[in-house]
Amino acid sequence: MRDSMSEADRSSPGSGKTDREDETAENATQDVIAVTPDDERTGLANRLDAHTGDGVRHRAFTCLLFDEDGRVLLAQRADRKRLWDTHWDGTVASHPIEGQSQVDATRQRLAEELGIEPHQYDKLEITDRFEYKRRYLDEGLEWEVCAVLQATLHDTSFDRDPEEVGGAMWVDYEDLYENPRYYRQLRLCPWFEIAMRRDFEGDADPVPDGTRA
């Protein structure tokens, strides 16, 4: 059944540690694209290595989908996630693979994680790109040059994959930024918080330091 929700829809708890170990093993078999601060490719890095120890700067994206009333669709990271498990994110976030554009990677994740297809939204646009580095407990870190993509949903139905998305809800985007005290129960992912702040404070720029499209 496809959903169009305004309140959180949480899955029942999974097996926790076992699922997390499975994800760690899966990450060890994958690569991410290592980049310079200006998002220039320097090579490939093992995904697990890029998120442990000192980390490796790599290419990533986060996507914010809105409805026609200005609400943003937030997704809760599943409890099997090793980093920022059960935290609330933008609509999707991930890493493109070698040879894949940010737009194509975003479309793929929207379809896989939420069952949202391209005919449901207008053109995806890269609205910002920034570098950040954050550690999470003793589990690892993110060190990313993160592109932000945005679009408006004309058909707000979706069908989340509980292995990836623990819950989903619509939130007034402006209210979330201006009144964070009302949303204290939502632990937000750092990359989403940065993207939202830059969006409202006028810092969003899809070209890092004005040097690259």
Swiss-Prot record:
GO biological process: one example: isopentenyl diphosphate biosynthetic process
Q: Which cofactor does it need?
A: Mg(2+); Mn(2+)
Q: Tell me the residue numbers annotated for binding Mn(2+).
A: 51, 58, 95, 142, 144
Return the Basic and acidic residues bias intervals: 1-10
Q: Which CDD domains match?
A: NUDIX_IPP_Isomerase
Enzymatic reactions: isopentenyl diphosphate = dimethylallyl diphosphate
Give the pathway listed in the UniProt entry for this protein.
Isoprenoid biosynthesis; dimethylallyl diphosphate biosynthesis; dimethylallyl diphosphate from isopentenyl diphosphate: step 1/1
Per UniProt, the keywords (alphabetical) are:
Cytoplasm, Isomerase, Isoprene biosynthesis, Magnesium, Manganese, Metal-binding
Q: Which GO terms describe its molecular function?
A: isopentenyl-diphosphate delta-isomerase activity; metal ion binding
What positions does the domain Nudix hydrolase occupy? Answer: 56-193
Q: Which major enzyme category is it? A: isomerase
**Alphabetized PROSITE patterns for the sequence:** NUDIX (PS51462)
Record function comment: Catalyzes the 1,3-allylic rearrangement of the homoallylic substrate isopentenyl (IPP) to its highly electrophilic allylic isomer, dimethylallyl diphosphate (DMAPP).
The name under which this protein is listed is Isopentenyl-diphosphate Delta-isomerase
Organism, per UniProt? Halobacterium salinarum (strain ATCC 700922 / JCM 11081 / NRC-1)
The primary gene name is: idi
